[in-house]
Amino acid sequence: MXPARALIDLQALRHNYQLAAEVIG
């Protein structure tokens, strides 16, 4: 896993966190 893959995973985690934050309110 390269660094690029880790960066993509990190961005995906941020996106999921933002979606969850909006749902929770």
From Swiss-Prot:
<comment type="similarity">
    <text>Belongs to the alanine racemase family.</text>
</comment>
<keyword id="KW-0413">Isomerase</keyword>
<comment type="pathway">
    <text>Amino-acid biosynthesis; D-alanine biosynthesis; D-alanine from L-alanine: step 1/1.</text>
</comment>
<dbReference type="GO" id="GO:0008784">
    <property type="term" value="F:alanine racemase activity"/>
</dbReference>
<keyword id="KW-0663">Pyridoxal phosphate</keyword>
<comment type="function">
    <text>Catalyzes the interconversion of L-alanine and D-alanine.</text>
</comment>
<protein>
    <recommendedName>
        <fullName>Alanine racemase</fullName>
        <ecNumber>5.1.1.1</ecNumber>
    </recommendedName>
</protein>
<dbReference type="GO" id="GO:0030632">
    <property type="term" value="P:D-alanine biosynthetic process"/>
</dbReference>
<comment type="subunit">
    <text>Homodimer.</text>
</comment>
